[in-house]
Amino acid sequence: MDIIENHDAWVETYTQNWLAHYNETGETKWDLYNRPNNKTAPSGKAIDLKQAKLVMISSAGAYLPDSQEAYDAENDLGDYTIRLIPNGTAYDKIAYAHTHYDHTAVNMDTQVLIPTGHLRDLVEAGEIGSLTDDFISFMGYQPNAAQVAEETVPAIIEASKAQGATGALLVPS
């Protein structure tokens, strides 16, 4: 299944409209942006969460400032890289480089976007089998959907498989 249905047509529209306007003016004009609209929702077979090894994937732009480079949050064209963060990391060691959402809630309670404590509680209660060693974060502001499909998604899949994940929890920002 294609990540973006009609991939080439989407790239052509993106390049000729939103990106061309941005390159000419330096302005992000969102009424020119054609969001991908798939007709088929991806799915797979159901999993038993009590037996699953779950990876959490967050678009919060989380990173470890003491050891990882921040995302390029000011780049109008986005940052398509990922960061792996150990699940046991203290919340005060995590920072957020993402300027495209209101940080009020996450500043008050990190678990609204990084619910690792709640997930560990569910593992302890036997509701989830286990968690991967690391969770995955990326900066959700990524206007080039083709680049997401060609770079970000494969990197997330590779990192998830390397940790033996059998299921994923997606946490949008």
Report each predicted region and the residues it spans.
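Metallocofactor- and cofactor-centric catalytic cores in central/energy metabolism, strongly enriched
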Residues: 1-173
